[in-house]
Amino acid sequence: MNMKNNADLEKLRLHLANRLTELAKENLNLLITLNSNNYIDIDNVIFDYDSNDYKEFSKTLADVLKYIDFSNISFAGFKAAGVNFTGYHNVTINPQTIAYKDLSNSVLKGVKFASRTYAEDIFKDVLLVNTNFTGSVGAQIIPETVKNLAGGKMASVTFFSKNNGEMFKGCDLSYMDFTGSYGAIVNPQVIYKKSLINTNLTDALLVRNTSFDDCYVTGTTFSGQDISLNPQTLRNKTIEHCHFNGVEFIGDDEMFKDIRILDNDFTGSKNAIIDVNAIVGNYIEGNNFADTTILNLLNGKRSSLPSQTKHLKLEGASIVVQNQEEQEAIQNLYGLSSNTKFVSQKDNDEAYLNRVVDELLESYLTRKLTK
């Protein structure tokens, strides 16, 4: 047989796949090291090559790749885009040498990235759209040299930058999840289109005194970020699917005026005032209003109000009412327990005035304490 002949090579692959399958039945932890010899290159067995001499895993071996130790296998020229490496052993990749510098849509669990110094920047110009780094080892990324990180799951990644305030300058962070990453510092004013659409900021830091002016915030998870947000300064007038834990809202009773708010979770936020009459269409379905203050819950012009009660969560909110009759009507309409917090209009106004005065005095008190 001639191992340079494609037909004979395919027969060899079939025999190898069958042998590994049988061995795996005897040893559930099977891990085999394959070696080249003087008449066959192991790369030609494991990989198929295209006309550009780029390579991909042989489909014939797809079910047994998990039994192969890749320690001595080079992935230079490998078409890694879209590949799920989960379950493969000892794969080491240098992103600068893979085909087209493309790791988009790949799942990199277990992959080790070739160790490099900061100056060498092994992810420079590499495509990382929808890339899942969870469970990988050694991924060190300088974001401004990558730009498009949209859709990425960045667990296990360490981020670096020479200028932390502009670490993600020009980068697309939409649909990106920072959970489990290290070192990320985000300035919404310098990212691509100022957009945090469906961005999960868990384990990232936002720059001090973060401004969200003209930013697009929807589907965003803040997860304990210590930041202030005025909804009126956002570019988008529909805010949905956000998790506002840690966010302090600033503004008066009309902070959500002319804004649609749908399916958000306000748990862990501060000072959010929900005036139902000010919201577009008075439509509040799907929101978890824990830790908010709600005005005009009963008086809003809501033709579809009864249909909203099913997915609306009011436990943990402070509901402002004019009198006992209004409180009872709200309890009956929404099926609320007697433990729901209701606040009189007078007490709510007093609390609001106290908070505003505290804010006005804050700078004075701070200066006095530092003298």
Language-model regions, residue ranges each:
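Non-Sec secretion/translocation targeting segments of pathogen effectors
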Residues: M1-K4, L365-K371
